[in-house]
Amino acid sequence: MPFGLIAQEKEIKSSNYFDDLTLEERKIIVKKGTERAWSGIYLSNTDKGMYVCKACNNPLFNSDSKFKSNCGWPSFDDEIDKAIIRKQDYSLGMKRIEICCSNCDGHLGHIFEGEGLTDKNIRHCVNSLSILFIPKK
């Protein structure tokens, strides 16, 4: 199959995931934005369950990995295996590691290491608008 057709199919597949998102969700998930600190619906959520990608419902984080980091966004010290891809991010004049959904490539937030906030020494800093919480039944 010619390269152009493969790229076109991928674009169509990806855009379908994002069709039902609100404008604000698209700004975060598709345009790689960041929601205002302390504004996210899941920041203080302590219920048991799972967090999935808002765009494609790919399981991302178990609630057991969520912790209070006082950074203004939901934080997790572990991810579900193969749920997330990491990308170098040089925006805003600094080097960071962006995290995206491994299924739809939607922007989730950034990952930080070496802060000493948990025993795993890692913080997935996630936009609430990028995720959906599924309560444990």
Please describe what each predicted stretch is.
Residues 1-9:
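Bacterial Sec-dependent N-terminal signal peptides
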Residues 8-137:
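A short Gly-Trp-Pro
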